[in-house]
């Protein structure tokens, strides 16, 4: 009987280790890097790739600061995306629509649209970007 209990306990422990954790806390400085923005390498940006370190995640969550003159170039979406403007000003576009954006606004981009966003003005454009993954990331 005690062998069965030990086997069951070991199996439960292995299952817990293979599953995604209940919570992950990520320090922004640990995931910060300067790089050209995606989709065209237009200018420079500072990327905070928060969700990259999260095992078993189902979504991306990032902060990107577009330096003066930088842009995330036009690209067709395979999912919905939300961009939240933390600071600065920019111009978002989707299909044939263009709109100015500023701090405190969110832009909801839809699956199948071709979209992008560019920094405008004297200050960098700081964004939070979130979207679902097509396939859940592997648990580590």
Language model features by range: what are they?
Residues 97-112:
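Short acidic-glycine-tyrosine-enriched beta hairpin
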Residues 13-58, 138-140:
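A short, N-terminal "cap"/entry segment at the start of jelly-roll beta-barrel domains
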Residues 78-90:
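Glycine- and acidic-residue-biased ligand/ion/polar-headgroup-sensing regions
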Residues 1-8:
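Sec-dependent signal peptide recognition
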Residues 56, 111-136:
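Ligand-binding loop in jelly-roll beta-barrel domains
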């Amino acid at each position: 009987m005690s062998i069965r209990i030990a086997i069951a306990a070991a199996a439960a422990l292995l299952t817990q280790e293979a599953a995604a954790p209940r919570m992950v806390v990520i320090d922004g400085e640990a995931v910060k890097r300067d790089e050209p923005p995606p989709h065209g390498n237009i200018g420079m940006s500072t990327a905070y790739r928060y969700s990259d370190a999260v095992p078993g995640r189902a979504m991306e969550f990032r902060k990107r600061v577009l330096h003066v003159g930088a842009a995330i170039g036009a690209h067709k979406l395979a999912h919905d995306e939300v961009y939240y403007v933390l600071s600065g000003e920019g111009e978002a576009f989707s299909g044939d629509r263009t709109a100015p954006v500023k701090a405190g606004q969110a832009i909801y981009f839809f699956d199948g649209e071709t979209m992008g966003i560019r920094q405008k003005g004297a200050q960098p454009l700081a964004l939070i970007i979130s979207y679902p993954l097509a396939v859940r990331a592997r648990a580590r």
